[in-house]
C-alpha cells in the first residue's frame, strides 16, 4: 500500500537511506565486537571496552533515527543482512582505533553520497536532516579518532604496552 504522507521523496533517496541504515548497523556490530574483545581477561583494557560499547550504541541510534525519518517521509524500511565484522581479534588498542577511524571515514563518505542523492532529487528536508544530525558529528568523531591514533603512536604503541595502558586509563577512562 502506498503511503499517504509521501511527498517529494524520491525512490533513490529511500533506497540510499536503507543502505545507510545497513551500514550504521554494521558499524554498531563492529564496535560491539571491539568492545567485548577489549573486555576479555587476556586483553583487559576497560577504557577501550567502554568507548567501543558507547560507539556501538551510538551507531545503532543513528540507524534507528534513519528508520524513524524513513517512516516520517512515507518511505519503506527494507532491512538487509548485516555483514559480520571484518575480524574477530582486534589486536592492540592502536590497531582497533585505526580500524575505527577507517570505519568512521567510510560511514562519512556514505553519508556524503546519501546527501548528494537527496540533493540531486531536490529533497531539502533530507539534506537538512543529514546536515543537522550526522555530518558535523562524523567530522568531529573522525578528528577525535585521528588525534588518538597520533597520540598512541607518539607514546610508542603498539610496541610499548605501557602506552596503551596509560591511554586506556587516562584518556578513555575519564
From Swiss-Prot:
Keyword Metal-binding (UniProt): yes
Domain of life from the UniProt record: Eukaryota
InterPro entries: Ferritin, Ferritin-like, Ferritin-like_diiron, Ferritin-like_SF, Ferritin_CS, Ferritin_DPS_dom
One Pfam short name: Ferritin
GO-annotated cellular components: cytoplasm
Tissue: Liver (at protein level).
Keyword rRNA-binding in annotation: no
Binding of Fe cation 2, residues: 59, 104, 138
Residues annotated as binding Fe cation 1: 24, 59, 62
Function text: Stores iron in a soluble, non-toxic, readily available form. Important for iron homeostasis. Has ferroxidase activity. Iron is taken up in the ferrous form and deposited as ferric hydroxides after oxidation. Also plays a role in delivery of iron to cells. Mediates iron uptake in capsule cells of the developing kidney. Delivery to lysosomes is mediated by the cargo receptor NCOA4 for autophagic degradation and release of iron.
Name this protein carries in UniProt: Ferritin, heavy subunit
Amino acid at each position: 500500500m502506498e503511503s499517504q504522507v509521501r511527498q517529494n521523496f524520491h525512490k533513490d533517496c529511500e533506497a540510499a537511506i536503507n543502505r545507510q541504515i545497513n551500514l550504521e548497523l554494521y558499524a554498531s556490530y563492529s564496535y560491539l565486537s571491539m568492545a567485548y574483545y577489549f573486555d576479555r581477561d587476556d586483553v583487559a583494557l576497560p577504557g577501550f571496552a567502554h568507548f567501543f560499547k558507547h560507539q556501538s550504541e551510538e551507531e545503532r541510534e543513528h540507524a534507528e533515527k534513519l528508520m524513524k525519518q524513513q517512516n516520517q517521509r512515507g518511505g519503506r524500511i527494507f532491512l538487509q543482512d548485516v555483514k559480520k565484522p571484518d575480524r574477530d581479534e582486534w589486536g592492540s588498542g592502536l590497531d582497533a582505533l585505526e580500524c575505527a577511524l577507517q570505519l568512521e571515514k567510510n560511514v562519512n563518505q556514505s553519508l556524503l553520497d546519501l546527501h548528494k542523492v537527496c540533493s540531486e532529487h531536490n529533497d531539502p528536508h533530507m539534506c537538512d536532516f543529514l546536515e543537522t544530525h550526522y555530518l558535523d558529528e562524523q567530522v568531529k568523531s573522525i578528528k577525535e579518532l585521528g588525534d588518538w591514533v597520533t597520540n598512541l603512536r607518539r607514546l610508542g604503541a603498539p610496541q610499548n604496552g605501557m602506552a596503551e595502558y596509560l591511554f586506556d586509563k587516562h584518556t578513555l577512562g575519564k
